[in-house]
Structure formats: C-alpha cells, structure tokens
C-alpha cells in the first residue's frame, strides 16, 4: 500500500446512525478497511510506504503493517540533499492574543487529538466554533495581515522567487485574509490567490474568487511558474498534501494542525531548489508544541536534531558562522565607516 495512512486503517466494527431520504434514522454497521482486508487475505504479507506514520486510536501504522522494515528519516534526507531543512519562527505575540484565547487554542489541539467518541467530537465542534470567532475577529485579522505584509516584504519577497503560502483556519477566514491583504496592498491583485473548495451556498462574490476547477488548475500553473506575478497562495486544506513546488520557501500558518497533517503541510517548503538553504514556517497559532509532538512519531535521531524548534537556537549559530566568514574576508581593512558612517547617497 502506497501512502499507508490512506484508507488502510480500522479493525473495529462500529454502528453509525444516519438519516435516509425520508428523514428517518437508520443504523448501519461500519467495519474498518484493515479488518476487511485482513479477513479476506489472512495469509497475505502487508507492506506500507509512508512519510507520515500514524499512532492514534484505530489508526496505527505499525498495528496494520507491522514494525518498520527501513526508515529514511528527515535527517538523512537533508544530509543526502534530497530535501532542505525547515526552520520555525513564532510570531504569535504579534497578534496580541489574550491568555483565554491562547488557552482555547491549546484546548483545540487536545480536541483534535482525541476525536474518538461522540461526546468528545461534539465538544470539539463547540471549541472549533469558538476558534472561528476568535481567529476570525476583525481586529485579529487586521493584526495578522499587517504582520504578514510586513514580514513578507522585509524578509521573503526577494528571497528566491518570492513564493509563499498562507494556511487559513477556515474558508471564511481565508476570504477575510484575502480581502484584508488587498485592502492593505491594492496592487497585489495579481500577486495573491485563494485556493479552496467551493460550496453551493457560497455567496456570489466568493464564487468569483474561488472559481471553477479549471480556474484552480490555472492558479496552480501560475503559482508553479517562478516568473509569474502570482506569489502568495491562500489555502485551507488544498495544496497541503501532494502539491510539489520546489521554489516555495515560506509558509504562514494560521490554522491549528497536529500529527501527520502538520508534518505533511510543512513538507511543502522542504523541497530542493537552486540556492534554497531551507524552508521557513511562520507560526501565528502556536504550533510549536504540536510540531514537537509530531516529531515523536519519527526517529530518535530526528527528535534530537529537530526537537528544539526555536529558530534563534538553530539558525543563529549559522548566521554567526557566515558573519565570521565575512570578517575573515575583510581582515586588514578598516570597515568601521561602513558600520558607523552615514548612508550612501
């Protein structure tokens, strides 16, 4: 099975209540795919290939396929030059979120990890609804977009091809981000695009922006074209898996994610591209703890190397190393005027 997390799991038998066309409730028995396949082929050998193993209730990679035969971890991939390292920068403080909001975000992460029974799922739905209100507040969206614009223009716009992705919490919030960015930068009309699924009940102005399937395909073509003026894609779920774009180097995260979903998302920025030293994850919702937890699903070697996601501790020593190279090149020259002199006219 390729991509071993997709549809291969489930040893349990569950009873699910659904409504028929007449509005009557009916009970249906649902049996997990893993049990069906194992019962049908009891003597078969099961081998799975995945970059994101799962360890959750009724969804456990090793429970279905057995222990690991071989591991090609992120550390090895970076050492081999197959991928680039991913760096992390927290900018949660820029949104001026209060302690109650931060506590709600933490509770949401817990709910995402524990969706196992009806009561927990119902509780998590309530939390997710609260998150929609908090993260979608006009003042928060204003702070978010102002900081993204400032960060992008200062540090990322002129890096490589300037391609970046904004991961929004929901479809309504994605639209708010899109409109606020255009309000702040009216000339960005060709620079940004929204990529998400549409619905029959969407407002007409949404439909014009979301477009048809062919429109999304055109956006993908434009975004992958390094010379195209489209530089920033606003997404919710689409393009977070299976979208390969080597020049993409920046991801702004405004959506709580955890586990394999988080690992797959950040992998969008670790592809190899000319002169690309690494990808950057800019965090606005406090994913650091979730990222560390996700790392526990990987090898001890990766945990020791990537366990501390503080970019200052990881990248600053490299900056000092490069700075020393510059100092060595200028050895014997008096460059004090460059540091303390007036700007060149």
Question: Each PLM stretch: what is its role?
Answer:
Residues 9-101:
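Post-DEXD/H (motif II) to motif III coupling segment of the RecA-like Helicase ATP-binding lobe
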Residues 186-187, 268-278:
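Arginine/glycine-rich "motif VI" loop of SF2 helicases in the C-terminal RecA-like domain
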Residues 231-235, 239-257, 261-264, 279-283:
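A short beta-strand element within the Helicase C-terminal
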Residues 125-235:
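Conserved C-terminal RecA-like helicase domain
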Residues 3:
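Walker B catalytic acidic pair
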Residues 273-345:
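Long, hydrophobic alpha-helical segments
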Residues 11-21, 29-32, 60-67, 103-105, ...:
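Short secondary-structure boundary/capping segments
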Residues 58-161, 178, 321:
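Interdomain helical connector at the RecA1-RecA2 junction of SF1/SF2 helicase-like NTPases
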């Amino acid at each position: 099975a390729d991509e071993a997390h997709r549809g291969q799991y489930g040893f349990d038998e569950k009873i699910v209540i659904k409504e028929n066309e007449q509005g009557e409730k009916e009970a249906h028995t649902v049996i997990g795919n893993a049990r069906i396949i194992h019962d049908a082929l009891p003597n078969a050998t099961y081998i799975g290939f995945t970059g994101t193993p799962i360890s959750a209730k009724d969804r456990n990679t090793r429970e279905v396929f057995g222990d690991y035969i071989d591991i090609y971890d992120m550390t090895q991939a970076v050492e081999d030059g197959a991928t680039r390292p991913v760096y992390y920068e927290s900018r949660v403080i820029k949104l001026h979120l209060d302690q109650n909001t931060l506590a709600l975000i933490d509770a949401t992460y817990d709910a995402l990890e524990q969706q196992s029974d009806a009561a927990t799922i119902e509780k998590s739905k309530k939390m997710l609804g609260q998150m929609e209100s908090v993260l979608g507040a006009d003042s928060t969206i204003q702070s978010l977009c102002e900081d993204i614009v400032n960060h992008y223009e200062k540090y990322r716009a002129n890096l490589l091809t300037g391609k970046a992705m904004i991961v929004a919490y929901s479809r309504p919030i994605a639209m708010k981000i899109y409109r606020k960015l255009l309000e702040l930068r009216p000339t960005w009309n060709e620079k940004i695009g929204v990529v998400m699924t549409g619905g029959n009940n969407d407002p007409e102005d949404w439909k014009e922006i979301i477009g048809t399937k062919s429109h999304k395909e055109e956006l993908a073509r434009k975004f992958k074209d390094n010379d195209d003026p489209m530089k920033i894609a606003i997404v919710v779920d689409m393009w977070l898996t299976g979208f390969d774009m080597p020049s993409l180097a920046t991801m702004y995260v405004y959506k709580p994610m955890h586990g394999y979903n988080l690992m797959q998302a950040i992998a969008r920025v670790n592809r190899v591209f000319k002169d690309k030293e690494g990808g950057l994850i800019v965090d606005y919702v406090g994913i650091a703890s979730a990222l560390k937890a996700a790392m526990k699903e990987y090898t001890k070697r990766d945990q020791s190397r990537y366990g501390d996601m503080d970019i200052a501790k990881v990248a600053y020593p490299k900056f000092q190393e490069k700075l020393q190279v510059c100092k060595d090149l200028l050895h014997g020259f008096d460059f004090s005027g460059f540091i303390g002199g007036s700007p060149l006219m």
